[in-house]
From Swiss-Prot:
It is an enzyme of class 3 (hydrolase). The lineage of its organism: Eukaryota, Metazoa, Chordata, Craniata, Vertebrata. Residues 20-148 form the C-type lysozyme domain. Residues 1-19 form the signal peptide. It is found in: Secreted. Monomer. Keywords: Disulfide bond, Glycoprotein, Glycosidase, Hydrolase, Secreted, Signal. Glycans are attached at residue 58. The active site is at residues 54, 71. Pfam families: Lys. This is Lysozyme-like protein 1. GO terms for cellular component: extracellular region. It catalyses: Hydrolysis of (1->4)-beta-linkages between N-acetylmuramic acid and N-acetyl-D-glucosamine residues in a peptidoglycan and between N-acetyl-D-glucosamine residues in chitodextrins. Its EC number is 3.2.1.17.
């Protein structure tokens, strides 16, 4: 029985090790380099604010919704419309596996987020942004981060 407990502890450490929670400034640099500053007319602070309220900058965040779909990754991108998981009848507009949205490499998540902003009503897709960031001063989000 003791070995089962030790095994469970090892597994939990390996799961935690795979999760990455970025700092605000590290994410600001990644987002700026990826061209998110002013993408779709939204300043960098909007992206940082949205990612904070959607996932607290956690790349492996997953939330199962009442309709059975799942929101994935740092931007909480939904499986029903934007990515492909094991469920059928998904639109997969980003042409990406949902698992690609929960890795430390943010490339697929950023490309998909750009597509969402371009093909929907801007950042209104994200409830976290609407409730906490819309029509607010976004300059504080990048303050002290050495990004222009």
């Amino acid at each position: 029985m003791k070995s089962v407990g030790v095994f469970a502890l090892i597994i939990s450490f390996s799961i935690v090790a795979e999760s990455k929670i970025y700092t605000r400034c590290k994410l600001a640099k990644i987002f700026a380099k990826a061209g998110l500053d002013n993408y779709g007319g939204f300043a960098l602070g909007n992206w940082l604010c949205m990612a904070y309220y959607e996932s607290h900058y956690n790349t492996t965040a997953e939330n199962v919704l009442e309709d059975g779909s799942t929101d994935y990754g740092i931007f909480q991108i939904n499986s029903f419309t934007w990515c492909r998981n094991a469920r059928k009848h998904q639109k997969n507009h980003c042409h990406v596996a949902c698992s690609a949205l929960i890795t430390d490499d943010l490339t697929d998540a950023i490309l998909c987020a750009k597509k969402i902003v371009k093909e929907t009503q801007g950042m209104n897709y994200w409830q976290g942004w609407k409730k906490n960031c819309e029509n607010k001063d976004m300059s504080e989000w990048k303050r002290g981060c050495e990004v222009s």
